């Protein structure tokens, strides 16, 4: 079996054990394919993830920040952006084909992929049809590292624009801890009241942390 960097090559490891056992750096190394003089591709992958703080930090970095790294040019930047876009489209297409209530795990993974590593609080709304399939999702409000101000009327206006019958609310906690605050619960109540005037249901509010997601519906708070 081929070895890289003193260990089993990521591609060989993937073929033998499956992609799920690979680390973030190993998966990235498969996409990058080659390193640079003096730095093996595995070392390069590990360095990039460490430099940007996380895999999400890496794939969401802009062109200037990424290309400032030695060995990263247009080609590797394009590869990294393609990874991010493919992942997003995969989740989106899956969500749009079935009711989100039938597969809550996919919904939570989708939201974690988008929100879990953001440095500011982001309030996202998923707009659903009458069969609870996703019409579209939108990051509606951006806050600070510890709070986000929302406007229920804007959410209702957007829901009417796309003819949504129901919503799923979501926001992240940059601290990494997903436990909802009293402010989160009050915010949810305000949105529910505004939506109920037009018979739009709020099915859930998900608070996203790092590696965890808390559902208001599962806690019986709606």
Swiss-Prot record:
Record: residues binding Zn(2+): 171, 173, 184
Please name the SUPFAM superfamilies in this protein's record.
JAB1/MPN domain, RuvA domain 2-like
Instruction: Report keywords, A-Z.
Output: Hydrolase, Metal-binding, Metalloprotease, Protease, Zinc
User: Can you provide one Gene Ontology molecular function annotated for this UniProt record?
Assistant: metallopeptidase activity
Listed CDD domains:
MPN_DUF2466 (cd08071)
The MPN domain sits at 100-222
Keyword Protease applies: yes
UniProt keyword Zinc present: yes
Any one Gene Ontology biological process term? proteolysis
Residues annotated as signal peptide: none
As annotated in the record, motif JAMM motif runs over 171-184
Q: Which PROSITE patterns match?
A: MPN (PS50249), UPF0758 (PS01302)
The family line of this record is: Belongs to the UPF0758 family. YicR subfamily.
PANTHER family attached to this UniProt entry: DNA REPAIR PROTEIN RADC, UPF0758 PROTEIN YEES-RELATED
**Name by which UniProt lists this protein:** UPF0758 protein YE0063
Q: Which organism is it from?
A: Yersinia enterocolitica serotype O:8 / biotype 1B (strain NCTC 13174 / 8081)
């Amino acid at each position: 079996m081929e070895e890289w960097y003193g260990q089993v090559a990521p591609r060989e490891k993937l073929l033998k054990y499956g992609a799920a056992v690979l680390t973030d750096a190993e998966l990235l190394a498969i996409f990058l394919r080659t390193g640079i003089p003096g730095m093996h591709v595995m070392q390069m992958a590990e360095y990039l993830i460490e430099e940007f703080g996380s895999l999400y930090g890496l794939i969401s970095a802009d062109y200037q920040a990424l290309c400032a790294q030695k060995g990263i040019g247009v080609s590797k930047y394009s590869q990294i952006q393609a990874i991010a876009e493919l992942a997003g489209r995969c989740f989106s297409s899956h969500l749009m084909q079935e009711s989100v209530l039938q597969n809550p795990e996919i919904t939570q993974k989708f939201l974690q992929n988008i929100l879990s590593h953001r440095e500011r609080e982001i309030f996202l709304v998923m707009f659903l049809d009458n069969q609870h399939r996703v019409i579209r999702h939108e990051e509606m409000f951006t806050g600070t590292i510890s709070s986000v101000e929302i406007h229920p009327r804007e959410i209702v206006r957007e829901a009417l624009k796309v003819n949504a019958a129901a919503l799923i609310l979501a926001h992240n906690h940059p601290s990494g801890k997903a436990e909802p605050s009293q402010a989160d619960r009050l915010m949810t109540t305000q949105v529910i009241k505004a939506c109920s005037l037009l018979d739009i249901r709020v099915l859930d509010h998900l608070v996203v942390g790092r590696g965890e997601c808390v559902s208001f519906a599962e806690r019986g708070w709606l």
